[in-house]
Amino acid sequence: MALINPQFPYAGPVPIPGPAPTETMPLLNYRVEGRIAGIQQARQFMPFLQGPHRAVAEQTYHAIGTGIQMGQTFNQPLINTQEG
């Protein structure tokens, strides 16, 4: 269950700056960029969280950040670097 601060209601998806996804930009990368934008927006509201809500938000923030780093590491195309 998401805790929503009535002072800052969620207004819907965050628009992502930059080019629209194409065949050369896999959908997974586009979703990762969207999550990064969402985390950057959520970071603005972190000071308003108190006590256990803040602790949970910080744990979630770090867990998502770790997941994004892993996703970027393991979502690389397989490239044969051997010549000849």
Curated annotation (Swiss-Prot):
Superkingdom field: Viruses
One Gene Ontology term from the biological process aspect of the record: viral capsid assembly
Keyword Acetylation applies: no
Subcellular location as annotated: Virion
GO cellular component, one term: viral capsid
InterPro entries (alphabetical): Tecti-min-caps
Alphabetized UniProt keyword annotations: Capsid protein, Virion
Protein role: Minor capsid protein essential for stable capsid assembly of complete particles.
Subunit comment: Dimer.
Protein name: Minor capsid protein P30
